[in-house]
């Protein structure tokens, strides 16, 4: 169920990994760190250095959404082929920060050889892909609610992700 805004469970890449119905719901609800990297170029690689300034926030709020601005290309032919990517080193940095959920406004966090997918999912970090309308979030501090369907033994699920801004 990798269509629209959806969540990947570890089982997507990790044999014997958690399936979508085994993702603890508390990982899907709570304070979130919002990293704005707007206007990323096609094929731009997001490196650990791009994220390091957010270390303290990531330690306090281990859910993270990265805004690249790419979702605005949804109707273009290159949406699925040219999107920005998270490097394996950036994924390792986020795992070291204790992140347990990452969301992006791209169709995938990476491409073959899927270093970011493997790093995240082997450490039980749930991945949300294809987020939209992130420009509507005006605060860098908000509660994320992104619940997957309880689909037994599946590797992914659609989610309805919402940001509840805190005063």
Q: Predicted regions span which residues?
A:
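Active-/binding-site microenvironments in catalytic and ligand-binding cores
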Residues: 1-167
